[in-house]
């Protein structure tokens, strides 16, 4: 029987043919955690008396949520994890100077057809290269770290086709918000979303990573882009090898199908306090903005900063603006291309590789009564700081234009 991408990956990982609804044990290709969740993962392992890993090469650890540590407790957590890394001789450890876990997985480790589990909900980001990637709780990740296995209920597969080419200032965030606006945040529960791109070059890896990252906001079990030449080129460019490609079979059965015409999209925002409270930018244009955040594992990549730099070049922001590329490699490339200089000259505060403001942790927490425009993934009440703050989610073009004007602004005003 023809299989979807989801069914193919889980069949390979379980060693038997699977169908939606099956509960199977699968081998994991990567198990990962970061500083904020790593403490709990290690605690579970210690309590079980099983402080060991199934394969040192398949464990990935990164410091990002508490990087650099904003308080003594954060520093203590990182010290404990460094000790764990040293004792177990884990090679794929990335300290506070490397980047956000999900970006690191995308840049260095994830491959088409992989099963990836990590102790963070935005693990779905690795679906951009066609990996079945899920965020799990600390106990399940601890079990995967020890045994190299986890259990999965095989989800139904939902097919989305992207047609055409996106217009100016449109990127992956607008596609993610389009899906959330049309289907709402609970529609895809128990499903895996598989996205096909009719013209692969029209929707590059940066855009795909944003959409996959927000798969968890759609309550999808996974969100994967079907691998194509863009996938191959990305991995070959970043890692120097050509990956094996896994694609669904012709005639595979999907629970439903949906098409998005990229050429018809306009800039979208998610208004407070829900990711599916989606509006066109024109519906909220003119609202005063106190702070703008451009970055995170959702929109902290080169194309995001290219867009922001084009809008901000030679100008000064009117709102506070924080810009955080998702990794050191991205920060360095953005410097080489002049984007960091442009943002700094425009009055932005720039660092790299920290989750900081996204989770209301540090480096730009929202105060009472403040309105934030953010390229991150969530706008729940209190997500970025005060419960009395409001967060509007948007792509980098809306964010940069809003920082420039000090109010929510349609970027199409800038040619």
Swiss-Prot record:
Chain residues that bind [4Fe-4S] cluster: 297, 355, 358
A GO term for molecular function: metal ion binding
Note on cofactor: Binds 1 [4Fe-4S] cluster per subunit.
GO biological process: L-leucine biosynthetic process
Pfam families per record: Aconitase
Pathway: Amino-acid biosynthesis; L-leucine biosynthesis; L-leucine from 3-methyl-2-oxobutanoate: step 2/4
SUPFAM superfamilies assigned: Aconitase iron-sulfur domain (SSF53732)
Keyword terms, alphabetized: 4Fe-4S, Amino-acid biosynthesis, Branched-chain amino acid biosynthesis, Iron, Iron-sulfur, Leucine biosynthesis, Lyase, Metal-binding
Catalytic activity: (2R,3S)-3-isopropylmalate = (2S)-2-isopropylmalate
Required cofactor names: [4Fe-4S] cluster
Listed EC numbers: 4.2.1.33
Enzyme class: lyase
Family: Belongs to the aconitase/IPM isomerase family. LeuC type 2 subfamily.
HAMAP family reported in the protein's UniProt record: LeuC_type2 (MF_01027)
Record's subunit section: Heterodimer of LeuC and LeuD.
Function: Catalyzes the isomerization between 2-isopropylmalate and 3-isopropylmalate, via the formation of 2-isopropylmaleate.
Identification of the protein by name: 3-isopropylmalate dehydratase large subunit
Species this chain originates from: Sulfurisphaera tokodaii (strain DSM 16993 / JCM 10545 / NBRC 100140 / 7) (Sulfolobus tokodaii)
Gene behind the chain: leuC
């Amino acid at each position: 029987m023809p299989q979807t991408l989801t069914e193919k990956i889980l069949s390979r990982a379980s060693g038997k043919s699977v169908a939606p609804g099956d509960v199977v044990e699968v081998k994991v290709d990567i198990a990962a955690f970061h500083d904020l969740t790593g403490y709990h993962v290690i605690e579970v392992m210690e309590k079980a008396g099983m402080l060991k890993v199934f394969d040192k090469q398949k464990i990935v650890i990164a410091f990002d949520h508490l990087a650099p540590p904003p308080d003594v407790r954060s520093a203590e957590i990182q010290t404990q994890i460094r000790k764990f890394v040293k004792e177990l001789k884990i090679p794929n450890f990335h300290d506070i100077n490397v980047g956000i876990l999900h970006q690191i997985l995308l840049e260095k480790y994830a491959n088409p057809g992989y099963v990836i589990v990590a102790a963070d909900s935005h693990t779905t980001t690795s679906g951009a290269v066609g990996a079945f990637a899920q965020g799990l709780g600390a106990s399940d990740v601890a079990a995967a770290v020890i045994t190299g296995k986890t259990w999965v209920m095989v989800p139904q597969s939902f097919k989305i086709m992207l047609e055409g080419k996106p217009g100016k200032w449109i990127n992956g965030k607008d596609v993610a918000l389009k899906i959330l606006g049309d289907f709402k945040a609970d529609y895809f529960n128990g499903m895996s979303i598989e996205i096909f791109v009719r013209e692969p070059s029209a929707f590059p890896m940066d855009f795909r990573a944003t959409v996959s990252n927000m798969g968890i906001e759609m309550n999808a079990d996974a969100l994967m882009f079907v691998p194509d030449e863009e996938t191959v080129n990305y991995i070959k460019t970043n890692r120097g090898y050509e990956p094996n490609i896994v694609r669904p079979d012709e005639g595979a059965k999907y629970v439903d199908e949906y098409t998005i015409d990229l050429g018809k999209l306009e800039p979208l925002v998610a208004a407070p306090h829900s990711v599916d409270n989606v509006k066109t930018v024109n519906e909220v244009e003119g609202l005063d903005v106190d702070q703008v955040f451009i970055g995170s594992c959702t929109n902290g990549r080169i194309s995001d900063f290219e867009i922001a730099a084009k809008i901000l070049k030679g100008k000064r922001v009117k709102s506070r603006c924080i810009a955080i590329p998702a990794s050191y490699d991205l920060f360095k490339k953005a410097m080489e291309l002049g984007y960091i200089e442009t943002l700094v000259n425009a009055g932005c505060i720039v660092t790299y590789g920290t989750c900081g403001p996204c989770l209301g942790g540090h480096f730009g927490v929202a105060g009472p009564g403040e309105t934030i425009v953010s390229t991150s993934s969530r706008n729940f009440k209190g997500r970025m700081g005060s419960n009395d703050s409001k967060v509007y989610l948007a792509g980098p073009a809306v964010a940069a234009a809003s920082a420039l004007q000090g109010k929510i602004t349609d970027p199409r005003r800038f040619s």
